[in-house]
Amino acid sequence: MIVVTHTAVVQVLIHMEWIADPSIWAGLVTLVVIELVLGIDNLVFIAILAEKLPPAQRDRARITGLMLAMGMRLLLLASISWLVTLTKPLIVFHDFSFSARDLIMLFGGLFLLFKATVELNERLEGKDSDNPTQRKGAKFWAVVAQIVVLDAIFSLDSVITAVGMVDHWR
């Protein structure tokens, strides 16, 4: 038989006082809105990548890519407390210093610029249909891998933004 004393109930309620704090709820709503806004660009890239596949494989690639990307995002969230501590300068160049976190963001941003440039070039310039060596379609797992990598990069940006907001409110 379990006996719950009045003191135990009061201690639990004291530890749950954060539930009634309006600033916590405002912060949660703000984080959700930020994640939604920052997630839109991710969906655009996923749609562009999935379009390279034959129509029969597009939905499967989107679902598989998003499921794997969700796992990647959960791993990133679990390790974010470690990631935000990577502020010790690794490279110093004149007056500029770069930490591991800065380098991750820099290379992620460069990858996104490269990917966006390649996609825009393909769409604006078109493909040379007379070229017999040109690939007819993308490979399923190559597209899924690109979806996961792009989601990881976009997640890194939004998770660091969210952690920065939470640290600011403390």
Curated annotation (Swiss-Prot):
<dbReference type="Pfam" id="PF03741">
    <property type="entry name" value="TerC"/>
</dbReference>
<dbReference type="GO" id="GO:0005886">
    <property type="term" value="C:plasma membrane"/>
</dbReference>
<protein>
    <recommendedName>
        <fullName>Uncharacterized 18.9 kDa protein in cps region</fullName>
    </recommendedName>
</protein>
<comment type="similarity">
    <text>Belongs to the TerC family.</text>
</comment>
<dbReference type="InterPro" id="IPR005496">
    <property type="entry name" value="Integral_membrane_TerC"/>
</dbReference>
